[in-house]
Amino acid sequence: APAGSAVTRQLINRMKLYRVEYAEIEGEEPAPQEEAPKPVKEAKTYAQESKTHSQKVAGSSEFRTFQIEYVQAIELMKQLYTAAIKDNKPIDSQKLLGSVADLFQSRNTIVEMFDMLYNMRTVADSVYAHSLNVALISRMIGRWLRFERHDLDILTLAGLMHDIGKLLIPSDILNKPGSLTDEEFAKIKQHPALGYEILKRQPDLDSRIKKAALMHHERCDGSGYPTGLTEDYIDNFAMIVAIADVYDAMTAARSYRSPLCPFEVISKFEEDGFQKYHTKYILVFLKQIASTYQSNRVILSDGRGCTIVMLNQNALSRPIVQFDDKSCLDLSTASRDLYIKAVL
């Protein structure tokens, strides 16, 4: 959208997609051009409008329904997982799928889904909330890959249960702010095997769900854990869940950093993702995410505002942008110090 145009719901939803509550401007403010608004001022305007939209979404009847369904899904996960761990009871997969189906009802796009998820950031049970988010994202990836309904359901369950082993890790380690010690990280790295052992006692679960718990930290180049498997030995569903897992972690706020901008996330995947993740899955994921921002307003790392006019298929994190004076810049040929810092 050109400078001076109205802030639309679509524009704001894009901002919500990666939980960007405000646009942080780094670097010196560029000198204002004649008859043109200052980029910093423009960014603040969008942030103020988006905050108002966020408040409206949080107060809407649709969000209240989503909030109830989201919390109910987490409570169901708690109940079923606790019973499975403590009493070796079977996990009712159909109940879990029903809870996710409720969340997807009338929310058929990733923008609509994340507009709701953005406002659920205060949920305290991070393992459960993260697992639910990973399930929703994994199902979306499955849709992009045109999976059949049965496979979508299995993939969703794989996302829901991928981190069940973390429930056996001490909470003070899981919730520790800042860096982990080597000893603490070694304990964290036990959770895939612990999760697999829990799910192995569930005879009716599809083997792909169990493998996703065991293998979602494995990487195609052999750099993952717990066993350093390479691509030929990693289950396909585990590779999809791995992408959703990393995506949700990078776009979530942490005590030591703000949520990453979507194009920063894409850039990080481009740096080493094609070695670590299945090429087909990561390409579909990145292209779908990047295409969401076609014609969107963004802020560059030098503070200038511009609009995405074309994607570079070989450099999705660095599209061609157009400034308010109608001049264009291909970020794929620009300095690496110049990049998209915020999506509006």
Give the residues covered by each predicted segment.
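Membrane-cytosol interface segments
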Residues: 1-92, 336
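Histidine- and acidic-residue-rich, metal-dependent catalytic cores
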Residues: 63-64, 68-344
